[in-house]
Amino acid sequence: MIFISDIHHGLDSLNTLPKDKGPLVILGDLINWIDYRNGDGIAKDVFGEENVNELIQLRKKHDFSKRKKMWEQLFSEDRELKQQKIQDSIYKQYEEVFKILKNFEVFLIPGNVDSLEILEETKTKNVINIDGKVLDYKNIKFGFAGGGVPTPINARGEITEEEFKTKLEKLGDVDIICTHAPPYVDELITDVITNKKEQGWESLKTFIEYKKPKFSLFGDVHQPKAYEWIIGSTKCINVGYFRSTSSYLDLESLKI
């Protein structure tokens, strides 16, 4: 079993995945809205490079108020046409991702940029959305809780802290807790490229402290200050920004 996160339509990276490692677990964010390194993504295709570069700078400055106003301005003309272009691009990206993964056994949870409705429409038969469920694999109990942390951006895949907490409570005791976003620890949630604290779950940190799983696996923060952290007896691991690094975490490396 191998784990990846933040594919963000990285088709070249997907083509490098080994096919002899067992099931593939995807911890969210299959499509690419904006790549904050170079501006590539759906937003650039629809609104143009200049606008996206400005949006990136506003995010780096943490100016969500101006960013929100800019989004409103961008949609002020030809709104329906732009929304349709975005919708079409989302469908296309999911279809291309799932086409490459057709020969894998895939378990996934949604991330903050994912459109759950379109994901469900486009996923192939070999793909299981395991959000909110427990999986027993090789005598290891995995718990899965997807969704993005709520932010001023209000992305498609965001859920409330209370909704996420409820998911965790229903999972109960697990050996490995798998989420999209990390527990709320400064070193795990601070991105050195966007120059800000990204999102993290307070309830996940509490879950780890009380339930004491052996591992916490996640993604979401692309370039964190720390990729690994210890909370009590639990080792927390960011499995990597797959679009950029093509990296994956092999279950065997955890030596459970």
Residue ranges and their predicted role:
Residues 4, 9-137, 239-242:
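Core catalytic region of metal-dependent phosphoesterases/phosphodiesterases
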Residues 22-23, 174, 204-221:
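Proline-aspartate-enriched helix->loop->beta-strand connector
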Residues 31, 40, 171-190:
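Short acidic, glycine-rich surface-loop motifs adjacent to enzyme active sites
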Residues 140-176, 194-205:
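Binuclear metal-dependent hydrolase catalytic cores centered on His/Asp/Glu-rich metal-binding motifs
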